[in-house]
Design a protein with these regions (language model features):
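Conserved RNase H-like, two-metal-ion catalytic cores of nucleic-acid enzymes
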Residues: 1-93
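Metal-dependent phosphoesterase core characteristic of DEDDh/y 3'-5' exonuclease domains
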Residues: 2-6, 56-80, 92, 97-138
């Protein structure tokens, strides 16, 4: 397979967005009880604990940037940035460069969550989603 530079290998880590979940399901509960209530609702809806994609708050975005100059590892986390700041930094990569994206389950989880959360924060992600997709899992 021929890859074009630059290449971005990336992954996100998420937690349940309790505030959005409480709003969506009209839960008037103490914050400490919201996650348990959301899990119960999700089990009733789908038989699984895994929350709907829009209810995943991004707490970390990490990437490996590969280009003609070398390799660079980066990470944006909730320790130093708000979710909106992490997304702004990550999405700005696509305004300047058009990297080849590599991820694990990116088209089914990471990219949809990034899109949902960008919309939630009023951010544009159009450059990211003009990438196309190569699915080697077939």
């Amino acid at each position: 397979m021929n890859l074009r530079f630059p290449i971005l290998v990336f992954d996100i880590e998420t937690l349940t967005d309790l505030k959005a979940g409480a709003h969506l399901y009209h839960l008037d509960l103490p914050e400490a009880d919201v996650e348990q209530a959301l899990t119960k609702i999700r089990r009733q809806e789908s038989g699984m604990d895994f929350q709907r994609l829009p209810l995943h708050e991004i707490v970390c975005i990490s990437g490996l940037w590969i280009d003609e100059k070398g390799i660079r590892l980066f990470s944006f986390s909730q320790e130093q940035n708000t979710e909106a700041e992490m997304l702004t930094k990550f999405l700005s990569i696509f305004d300047k460069k058009q990297p080849t994206l590599i991820s694990w389950n990116g088209s089914q989880f990471d990219l949809p969550v990034i899109l949902f959360r960008a919309m939630y924060h009023g951010l544009s992600a159009s450059s990211l989603f003009d990438q196309g997709e190569i699915d080697n899992q077939k």
